[in-house]
């Protein structure tokens, strides 16, 4: 019994598989060509996908009603971040009732895994994962977001206010 097989017999084995694959491809091509309204593809720049309200996109620093940052530079978000992508530099505040505030708050989006641990760790609701997800950029420096980008970018229309006011927090003991 010979282990070697004839080349003509070997080529016959592949022919049904190739023809089956071509038939499947042609079936999908014709179906999509003549039923374009049923296609799942969106024309991206013109049409946008509707995401759930629970969608977690790019980070947002929330602001108070007076326009200042809600962040108290407690470093809990940076400590809780598994990717170690949050860098905060704190400074003392001029107001004696405020202990400290962030003078530098940076998030390296290329390292971030969008887990939401920073959002959960924050005791003052200062950081959230917002509804935006598009992050175009040319080089790596464009993906390190600072305070101005996180809290005051133009498409946020002046920042995102928190759900609970300071007075309501104080009454609730938060």
Swiss-Prot record:
Binds 2 [4Fe-4S] clusters per subunit. Its EC number is 7.1.1.-. [4Fe-4S] cluster 2 binds at residues 81, 112, 115, 118. It comes from the Bacteria. It is a peripheral membrane protein. Residues 61-91, 103-132 form the 4Fe-4S ferredoxin-type domain. Keywords: 4Fe-4S, Cell inner membrane, Cell membrane, Iron, Iron-sulfur, Membrane, Metal-binding, NAD, Quinone, Repeat, Translocase, Ubiquinone. [4Fe-4S] cluster 1 binds at residues 71, 74, 77, 122. SUPFAM superfamilies: 4Fe-4S ferredoxins. Its cofactor is [4Fe-4S] cluster. GO terms for cellular component: plasma membrane. Pfam families: Fer4_7 (PF12838). GO terms for molecular function: 4 iron, 4 sulfur cluster binding; iron ion binding; NADH:ubiquinone reductase (non-electrogenic) activity; quinone binding. It catalyses: a quinone + NADH + 5 H(+)(in) = a quinol + NAD(+) + 4 H(+)(out). It is found in: Cell inner membrane. InterPro entries: 4Fe4S_Fe-S-bd, 4Fe4S_Fe_S_CS, NADH_quinone_OxRdtase_chainI. NDH-1 shuttles electrons from NADH, via FMN and iron-sulfur (Fe-S) centers, to quinones in the respiratory chain. The immediate electron acceptor for the enzyme in this species is believed to be ubiquinone. Couples the redox reaction to proton translocation (for every two electrons transferred, four hydrogen ions are translocated across the cytoplasmic membrane), and thus conserves the redox energy in a proton gradient. NDH-1 is composed of 14 different subunits. Subunits NuoA, H, J, K, L, M, N constitute the membrane sector of the complex. HAMAP family: NDH1_NuoI. Belongs to the complex I 23 kDa subunit family. This is NADH-quinone oxidoreductase subunit I. It comes from Bdellovibrio bacteriovorus (strain ATCC 15356 / DSM 50701 / NCIMB 9529 / HD100). The lineage of its organism: Bacteria, Pseudomonadati, Bdellovibrionota, Bdellovibrionia, Bdellovibrionales.
